[in-house]
Amino acid sequence: MATGTDQVVGLGLVAVSLIIFTYYTAWVILLPFIDSQHVIHKYFLPRAYAVAIPLAAGLLLLLFVGLFISYVMLKTKRVTKKAQ
């Protein structure tokens, strides 16, 4: 069973994810249909970042997954050599 702290952290992560999803959805899907002179545009980054930010996040994710897999494989190889 999860402790109270785990539940609070989980709820916080869900809340942050929901806020990011709502912001990004409004930015990418709704904003192009609103007049460019409308005041709401000042609350959003330029459209070029709508592609650049997720691309950079995806590349960082792939980098960390690759590093983790490499680390685990090298560690397993060392343990196997010591056992022999």
Swiss-Prot record:
GO terms for cellular component: dolichol-phosphate-mannose synthase complex; endoplasmic reticulum membrane; glycosylphosphatidylinositol-N-acetylglucosaminyltransferase (GPI-GnT) complex. The chain crosses the membrane at residues 11-31, 49-69. GO terms for molecular function: enzyme activator activity; enzyme regulator activity. It is found in: Endoplasmic reticulum membrane. It comes from the Eukaryota. Pathway: Protein modification; protein glycosylation. Keywords: Congenital disorder of glycosylation, Congenital muscular dystrophy, Disease variant, Dystroglycanopathy, Endoplasmic reticulum, Membrane, Transmembrane, Transmembrane helix. InterPro entries: DPM2. Regulates the biosynthesis of dolichol phosphate-mannose. Regulatory subunit of the dolichol-phosphate mannose (DPM) synthase complex; essential for the ER localization and stable expression of DPM1. Part of the glycosylphosphatidylinositol-N-acetylglucosaminyltransferase (GPI-GnT) complex that catalyzes the transfer of N-acetylglucosamine from UDP-N-acetylglucosamine to phosphatidylinositol and participates in the first step of GPI biosynthesis. May act by regulating the GPI-GNT complex. It is linked to Congenital disorder of glycosylation 1U: A form of congenital disorder of glycosylation, a multisystem disorder caused by a defect in glycoprotein biosynthesis and characterized by under-glycosylated serum glycoproteins. Congenital disorders of glycosylation result in a wide variety of clinical features, such as defects in the nervous system development, psychomotor retardation, dysmorphic features, hypotonia, coagulation disorders, and immunodeficiency. Belongs to the DPM2 family. Component of the dolichol-phosphate mannose (DPM) synthase complex composed of DPM1, DPM2 and DPM3; in the complex interacts directly with DPM3. Component of the glycosylphosphatidylinositol-N-acetylglucosaminyltransferase (GPI-GnT) complex composed at least by PIGA, PIGC, PIGH, PIGP, PIGQ, PIGY and DPM2. Interacts with PIGA, PIGC and PIGQ. This is Dolichol phosphate-mannose biosynthesis regulatory protein. It comes from Homo sapiens. The gene is DPM2.
